[in-house]
């Protein structure tokens, strides 16, 4: 493609939106006319899959086109499955190449508005090694972390109570170690280097600070609004943030309307605490969650309206999705604050069940893609990376494995079969499930090797623990639970050798593919290690004098669109 023929690209990603929350995917209680318009004017994918069932690893895969385990963005722990502190030292490694960096190299102006949650700094609070501007974005306005219930002072804190308990126990144990080591040192029983004693003392201090900070500093230290490298609000004023993000997104389109541009709008909707403007409260039939969905849909409408007004619609590819499925366990009393995953079992945090990983996937490009088309083939969020590389007119990196596939032949109708024969579904670093789409037919087999134990039994979610674990208290299956999701998408009828003649051959084929996949994995630094996820005072972004951080540099006058 020539520079003049390459389209503008607008990527719209919701946070924790269930696939069953949209009218175009079967919901009849929440009104989403603008997202439905995208679907009616474009192509709708019905088997679109996230590479992880929680946000940080899913977004890492989206940005890089690679399974999170390849970049170290998959966790071996049940509680630390995402980045816990903005002042931690983990993040999307600098040697990973995002689609923004590719398109920037191809001559696109690139912008990210909204949630990042891929880390910020490595060694000092101002090095910003993981910052969006160091990952290919020319402009960033939003949250370098993500939205938490802690960001709204009136809400119940989101940091899990069991995480706090573990932090406290770790603090106590690590505090005892240097004290116990001092005894043999001064008794001269054996030599204990001061370096060892001080290392344990430092670790004890870091665990103590992380535990202490979880009881009141989370909002001030995690809920920060930035423009490029500058802190704009600390803590952010939650009632204003959606207004400011929309204004910035529309301004970016206006600024670079001569193109080509890439705009990634990473909504805070519909993550708790479901911050919603007064004009949308009570707007839906589904409570505050539905109100938040409808506010997001309205924001999508404003972006589409701007593209129309600037006469960019026909020359702009618009894509809408969610980072993972809706969360089932989030409640306030008897009120459900999470989304609907429709007919699919499970939800956010569950590595293999469809409800945690099946997400909306809508593409609109009026002059190229057929309006109203529906594709039932397996596709992945990782496919956006090679698709954008193709559209932008460039080449994929040749020095690494790219797990995504270019979707344009499928979207344009040049092929009818997905290029994915196998897809692997991880929960943290643990492979829970694998999917096989036979090349010669429409059948999609899915084998579960690990599934969560729901609590209470039969509840369909892990209400007792808040999120389903990836290891430990889980159910292991040998032989695996096998489903034909092309005929049984709700995964209610497990197959076995008695009711499926192909059972043994299918399982053998999938297990051979898993072995081949694992041969392609190479060891990388673990970004969710205990040390990386600990809060570190020297990495904490601060507007003002640490630890008394605070500022608001935004104008008081907001867009009249609100």
From Swiss-Prot:
Transmembrane segments: 167-187, 189-209
Annotated Gene Ontology cellular component terms: membrane
Posttranslational modification: The conversion to 3-oxoalanine (also known as C-formylglycine, FGly), of a serine or cysteine residue in prokaryotes and of a cysteine residue in eukaryotes, is critical for catalytic activity.
Binding-site residues, substrate: 115, 271
Annotated SUPFAM superfamilies: Alkaline phosphatase-like
Entry binding sites for Ca(2+): 15-16, 55, 323-324
Membrane topology: Multi-pass membrane protein
Main location: membrane
Lineage top rank: taxon: Eukaryota
PTM sites of type 3-oxoalanine (Cys): 55
Catalytic residues in the record: 55, 117
Subcellular location: Membrane
Record keywords: Calcium, Hydrolase, Membrane, Metal-binding, Transmembrane, Transmembrane helix
InterPro entries for this protein: Alkaline_phosphatase_core_sf, Sulfatase, Sulfatase_CS, Sulfatase_N
Cofactor binding, note field: Binds 1 Ca(2+) ion per subunit.
The protein's enzyme class: hydrolase
Molecular function per GO: arylsulfatase activity; metal ion binding
Pfam families reported in the protein's UniProt record: Sulfatase (PF00884), Sulfatase_C (PF14707)
Regions annotated as coiled coil: none
Statement: the UniProt record of this protein carries the keyword Mitochondrion: no
Similarity comment: Belongs to the sulfatase family.
Protein name as annotated: Arylsulfatase H
Gene that produces this protein: ARSH
